Curated annotation (Swiss-Prot):
<feature type="signal peptide">
    <location>
        <begin position="1"/>
        <end position="21"/>
    </location>
</feature>
<dbReference type="InterPro" id="IPR011696">
    <property type="entry name" value="Huwentoxin-1"/>
</dbReference>
<keyword id="KW-0964">Secreted</keyword>
<feature type="disulfide bond">
    <location>
        <begin position="54"/>
        <end position="68"/>
    </location>
</feature>
<feature type="disulfide bond">
    <location>
        <begin position="67"/>
        <end position="80"/>
    </location>
</feature>
<protein>
    <recommendedName>
        <fullName>U13-theraphotoxin-Cg1a</fullName>
    </recommendedName>
</protein>
<keyword id="KW-0732">Signal</keyword>
<keyword id="KW-1015">Disulfide bond</keyword>
<keyword id="KW-0800">Toxin</keyword>
<keyword id="KW-0872">Ion channel impairing toxin</keyword>
<feature type="propeptide">
    <location>
        <begin position="22"/>
        <end position="52"/>
    </location>
</feature>
<dbReference type="Pfam" id="PF07740">
    <property type="entry name" value="Toxin_12"/>
</dbReference>
<comment type="similarity">
    <text>Belongs to the neurotoxin 10 (Hwtx-1) family. 41 (Jztx-36) subfamily.</text>
</comment>
<dbReference type="GO" id="GO:0090729">
    <property type="term" value="F:toxin activity"/>
</dbReference>
<dbReference type="GO" id="GO:0005576">
    <property type="term" value="C:extracellular region"/>
</dbReference>
<dbReference type="GO" id="GO:0008200">
    <property type="term" value="F:ion channel inhibitor activity"/>
</dbReference>
<comment type="function">
    <text>Probable ion channel inhibitor.</text>
</comment>
Length: 88
């Protein structure tokens, strides 16, 4: 019983943060700077997707720079595969 209550509260908290970030994203930039608290502005960054110009796992490539981080272009069939690294 206690576990289900804690899980429910955690899910509600995540939904609140997600909804707040989505609302913040929809509002104009003028309103975003003046009305919202600083912690909400920082939470917005979590829900924004990164737009990268790279190929993901098993994507076609011609050189290593075409692939995303921790991926390398395999010469055999020209696809991006894990390069074996773990660091940032």
């Amino acid at each position: 019983m206690k576990v289900s209550v804690l899980i429910t509260l955690a899910v509600l908290g995540v939904m609140f943060v997600w909804a707040s970030a989505a609302e913040l994203e929809q509002s104009g930039s003028d309103q975003k700077d003046s009305d919202s608290p600083a912690w909400l502005k920082s939470m917005e960054r979590i829900f924004q997707s990164e737009e990268r110009d790279c190929r993901k796992m098993f994507g076609g490539c011609s050189k290593h720079e075409d692939c995303c981080a921790h991926l390398a272009c395999k010469r055999t069939f020209n696809y991006c595969a894990w390069d074996g690294s773990f660091s940032k």
